[in-house]
């Protein structure tokens, strides 16, 4: 069962995913239906990420600005908001306040 604040009946990969010299750290959560999410934190910085699969980024806390590949406009997101990123693309993210996020791979 999943609630707004937790995921139940899941497995968690113990080894952390550490990117960009520790500016982005996450853990992978595996669900019984075969889907996966990562739960992570990004420290204030500016980064460029690449995606394989489409992603849904849900901001739990903090604040960021995002510019999707091919766009010239930045969008700002805060706690309770989310943004989607197409697969096989890139996006720029500027973290203004330490970002606590859930990333779903669609």
From Swiss-Prot:
E.C. designation(s): 2.4.2.1, 2.4.2.2
Keyword Nucleus: no
Catalytic activity, as annotated: a purine D-ribonucleoside + phosphate = a purine nucleobase + alpha-D-ribose 1-phosphate; adenosine + phosphate = alpha-D-ribose 1-phosphate + adenine; cytidine + phosphate = cytosine + alpha-D-ribose 1-phosphate; guanosine + phosphate = alpha-D-ribose 1-phosphate + guanine
A Gene Ontology cellular-component term: cytosol
Molecular function as annotated in GO: guanosine phosphorylase activity; purine-nucleoside phosphorylase activity; thymidine phosphorylase activity; uridine phosphorylase activity
A family per Pfam: Ppnp
Keyword Transferase: yes
Keywords: Glycosyltransferase, Transferase
InterPro entries in alphabetical order: Ppnp (IPR009664), RmlC-like_jellyroll (IPR014710), RmlC_Cupin_sf (IPR011051)
UniProt similarity note: Belongs to the nucleoside phosphorylase PpnP family.
PANTHER family: PYRIMIDINE/PURINE NUCLEOSIDE PHOSPHORYLASE (PTHR36540), PYRIMIDINE_PURINE NUCLEOSIDE PHOSPHORYLASE (PTHR36540:SF1)
Role, per record: Catalyzes the phosphorolysis of diverse nucleosides, yielding D-ribose 1-phosphate and the respective free bases. Can use uridine, adenosine, guanosine, cytidine, thymidine, inosine and xanthosine as substrates. Also catalyzes the reverse reactions.
Protein name: Pyrimidine/purine nucleoside phosphorylase
